[in-house]
């Protein structure tokens, strides 16, 4: 999360590049709030600035995400509630794209990039989005992910994530047993390395 919205998909310790080098291209996914726009328009530095400006009605073109973060923290002048909501909306829009990726690639999510420093304001939006329900025309309701989502930045959630609830199940008419994941789960973590060291 930074100037733009990017992702790297790692499967069995190998970076997914895809047949055309487009593996992990989340930036071009559909934007939840503006379906005619790309996701990156709501998940980027410019998105934080735009949303803050929309919420306050004041020109924010000279503000950086760090400025808006400081406003959210209450250490700089400005609309604190609008600043928090600006990062929260980025989280919601990122969460929508992450859901789509996770329904194909089932694995841990690590958030990084320049804007990830505001994770405490972004993660609630991501978590709320990833825990929402979707439905059918018949009226049935399903979680948008088959897995329970854990914010690994929170100790209690981290400890629960580590709990093993899997078991071995006997195959009918056989002596063989197979591993059964009783508890489907996904963890969301925030990188502490920074983009330069991570790459």
Kindly give the residue locations of the regions a language model identified.
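Glycine-rich phosphate-binding loop of actin/hexokinase-like ATP-binding domains
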Residues: 1-46, 162
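ATP-binding/phosphotransfer module of carbohydrate and carboxylate kinases, centering on a glycine-rich
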Residues: 31-199
């Amino acid at each position: 999360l930074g100037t733009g919205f990017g992702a790297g998909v790692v499967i069995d310790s190998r970076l997914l590049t895809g047949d055309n080098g487009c593996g992990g291209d989340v930036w071009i996914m559909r934007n939840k709030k503006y379906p005619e726009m790309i996701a990156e328009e709501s998940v980027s530095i410019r998105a934080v600035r735009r949303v803050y400006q929309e919420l306050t009605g004041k020109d924010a073109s000279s503000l950086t995400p760090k400025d808006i973060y400081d406003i959210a923290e209450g250490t700089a002048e400005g609309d604190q509630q609008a600043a928090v909501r600006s990062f929260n909306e980025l989280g919601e829009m990122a969460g929508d794209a992450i859901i789509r990726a996770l329904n194909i690639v089932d694995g841990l999510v690590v958030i990084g990039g320049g804007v990830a420093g505001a994770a405490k304001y972004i993660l609630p939006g991501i978590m709320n989005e990833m825990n929402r329900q979707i439905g059918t025309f018949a009226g049935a309701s399903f979680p948008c992910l088959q897995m329970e989502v854990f914010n690994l930045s929170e100790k209690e959630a981290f400890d629960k994530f580590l709990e093993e609830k899997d078991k071995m199940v006997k195959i009918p008419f056989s002596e063989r047993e197979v591993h059964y994941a009783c508890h489907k789960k996904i963890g969301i973590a925030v990188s502490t390395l920074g983009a330069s060291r991570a790459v």
